[in-house]
Amino acid sequence: SAVDVGTGTGVLAAVLAQRWLSNIVATDNDPRALECARFNIQNLGMGKQIKVLEADLFPESKADLVVCNPPWLPGKPTSPIERAIYDENSGMLKAFLAGLAAHLNAGGEGWLILSDLAEHLNLRTREELLGWIEAAGLKVAGRLDAKPKHGKAFDNTDGLFDARCKEMTSLWRLVAA
């Protein structure tokens, strides 16, 4: 079983369903995101594998795998679309970490997909992130890193080039400590 917290378009839930899982719950608290996720999941023919639920973060159930790709930058969103980019005071990230252990089955894992762009922009430190993980009763079981391949990572005329060229997106494998 798996949960996709903050599913947005439903893409992570769909990838999980396509790869190997058949019992997936995808949650979001934004009505437009829920509508989009339901539309995409139905169009992909995955409606029997994925259940889309309205929730602030977690469903009531536990799972073997809980994934989350929260907004990457601490900041105040000024429009609904910006809620996918900015996470005021890192609220969603902190709440995901704080609630993760309670929503994992024994031996389960949480997968946090997060860019370190905020670190390169001095908006958050790695030490803060690791502190939040530890405070939540979690430990890092592993991490997979990927360098971005989008054009802005290589555009030295971009105002954020110094940060973007160092950016790494990571899949943090988290387990109960």
Residues covered by each model-derived region:
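Class I S-adenosyl-L-methionine-dependent methyltransferase catalytic core
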Residues: 17, 31-38, 42, 47-51, ...
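Short "lid" loop at the C-terminus of a central beta-strand within the Rossmann-like core
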Residues: 72-73, 115-120
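A short glycine-rich, Lys/Arg-flanked "PGG" loop and its adjoining helix->strand segment in the class I
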Residues: 93-106
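Conserved beta-strand signature within the Rossmann-like core of class I S-adenosyl-L-methionine
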Residues: 108-114
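Conserved class I S-adenosyl-L-methionine
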Residues: 118-128
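Class I S-adenosyl-L-methionine
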Residues: 129-130, 134-176
